Design a protein with these regions (language model features):
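C-terminal soluble interaction/assembly domains
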Residues: 250-266
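Extracellularly exposed regions in secreted/surface proteins, prominently low-complexity, repeat-rich
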Residues: 176-178, 261, 268-315
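Substrate-binding/active-site groove segments that recognize
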Residues: 104-119
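Alpha-helical segment that forms one wall of the substrate-binding/catalytic cleft
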Residues: 94-96, 116-164
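Flexible, glycine-rich surface segments
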Residues: 187-251
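N-terminal export signals and maturation junctions of secreted/periplasmic proteins
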Residues: 1-71, 182-185
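Short, functionally critical alpha-helical segments immediately adjacent to catalytic or ligand/cofactor-binding
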Residues: 69-70, 80-95, 156-157
Length: 315
């Protein structure tokens, strides 16, 4: 028995509608890929320095916030464990995004509440202030560095989900090792400014200002607008290869890479290695070896010499 004409027409219309939806989806995908060069957002990757293959991929926005949290912590003299706790907390609370909303009046990276004395809305939305407040509370907890991460974080945050921080510990550990400089050449970003391809013109003065904002005035960067560069002196000694100033240099260098998209940074050089925006491989490949003397002109770890981190902005 043939189907009624009404049902036939309805089926035909449904098929046409479904085809139109598929075509629209394909067209949207193609447009996004064309506009972004195949990637919706600039990305960053941090890799383990232990050779275990562990890695964590995140966005340029998250990289900027993570670098700020780490810089504020080390500038306060907090150990790497404190930075790990802070990063895991921010990953859980906000996904490392400086959000203007949350549960009740919670705001910012750590979802701090003005009504509970964390500061004003404007203060809490400042990542440097928010990180400083978190570390100030963490430092008051006796033996926090020996506590399980989720316990230490919960004593600061007093969250309704006290066990939730633990799941972020592996990623936070990778980030902290890299951003504190202990794991050298372990972080890379593609360096594309959000919403476009390539590296747009940058301003060395903006880079200098951001460095001082995150690390404090002691970082002493020197901006050279004519050469589009910022140079940060890192005093080096024989012992620095095992930590100390050498670790500080990598902290500054990987901070710069984390801020590449936001500040339109094109190249970062330190300790005989150079990172260039546009590299999409892993960190080991992105930080290429340069001359034996390194871009600063001083041999790595040479006694009495002064190494430097050199940051070049896009033109």
């Amino acid at each position: 028995m043939p189907e009624p004409p009404t049902l036939v027409r309805r089926g035909r219309l449904l098929r046409i509608g479904a085809a139109a939806v598929v075509l629209l989806a394909v067209a949207t995908y193609v447009a996004v890929q064309y506009a972004t060069g195949g990637r919706a957002k600039p990305r960053c990757v941090v890799a383990s320095a232990n050779g275990d293959g562990a890695s964590y991929e995140f966005t340029a926005e998250q990289a900027v916030n993570a670098a700020t949290i780490s810089a504020v912590g080390t500038s306060r003299g907090m150990p790497e464990r404190a930075v790990t706790i802070a990063l895991a907390t921010a990953l859980q609370e906000s996904g490392l995004r400086n959000i203007h909303h949350g549960d009740r009046d919670s705001l910012g990276l750590f979802q701090q509440r003005p009504s509970e004395g964390w500061g004003s809305e404007r203060q809490i939305m400042d990542p440097v202030y928010a990180a400083e407040r978190f570390y100030a509370h963490l430092a008051k907890i006796p033996g926090y560095s020996r506590l399980p991460l989720t316990v230490a974080a919960q004593r600061v945050q007093r969250s309704g989900y006290p066990q939730a921080y633990a799941k972020h510990e592996p990623d936070a550990t990778l980030l902290a090792a890299s951003l504190t400089g202990r794991a050298a050449a372990s972080l890379t970003c593609d360096g594309r400014p959000a919403g476009g391809d390539g590296t747009r013109a940058g301003d060395p003065a903006r880079v200098k200002s951001a460095l001082v904002r995150d690390f404090g005035k002691d970082v002493a960067p020197a901006a050279d607008r004519e050469r589009r560069s910022v140079r940060i002196p890192v005093p080096a000694t024989v012992e620095s290869a095992q930590g100390g100033e050498r670790q500080r240099g990598w902290e500054l260098a990987q901070w710069a890479v984390s801020n590449a998209s936001a500040l339109h940074i094109e190249r970062v050089s330190y300790a005989g290695r150079e990172w260039t925006a546009g590299d999409t491989g892993d960190a080991a490949d992105a930080w290429r070896k340069v001359s034996a003397k390194g871009p600063s002109g001083a041999g790595p770890g040479a006694s009495g010499s002064v190494e430097e981190v050199r940051i070049v902005t896009g033109q």
